Amino acid sequence: MRHYEIVFMVHPDQSEQVPGMIERYSETIKQGGGQIHRLEDWGRRQLAYPINKLHKAHYVLLNIEASAEVVEELETAFRYNDAVLRNMIMRKKESITEPSPLTKPKEDRKGDSEAA
């Protein structure tokens, strides 16, 4: 099985449905023999540019280990779900389990950029 990083954006009016969507997609992954290494709900965030005249969207990040069939099933689910505005699935070399920079407190992020 391969490792993937998935980010999908949900219509801001459908934010209350996000926990159900996450549960549904998690079940799809687990039933296909996959594993979720990291799951982060980033909440509503400003978009870099308007999509369908919207300026905000609800973001969700998943790092999973799954077969290609499961990933194809997720892609199909994203495509036919009208609430999902955009999605991105990237193949990774290894699993990523540490928290993403977006979930760190702002003080920690400032310290990281100064140290670089």
UniProtKB/Swiss-Prot annotation:
Keywords: Ribonucleoprotein, Ribosomal protein, RNA-binding, rRNA-binding. The keyword Ribosomal protein applies. The keyword Transport does not apply. GO terms for biological process: translation. GO terms for cellular component: cytosolic small ribosomal subunit. Coiled coil: none annotated. Residues 94-116 are annotated as: Disordered. GO terms for molecular function: small ribosomal subunit rRNA binding; structural constituent of ribosome. Residues 104-116 have a biased composition (Basic and acidic residues). InterPro entries: Ribosomal_bS6, Ribosomal_bS6_CS, Ribosomal_bS6_sf, Ribosomal_S6_plastid/chlpt, Transl_elong_EF1B/ribsomal_bS6. Belongs to the bacterial ribosomal protein bS6 family. Binds together with bS18 to 16S ribosomal RNA. This is Small ribosomal subunit protein bS6.
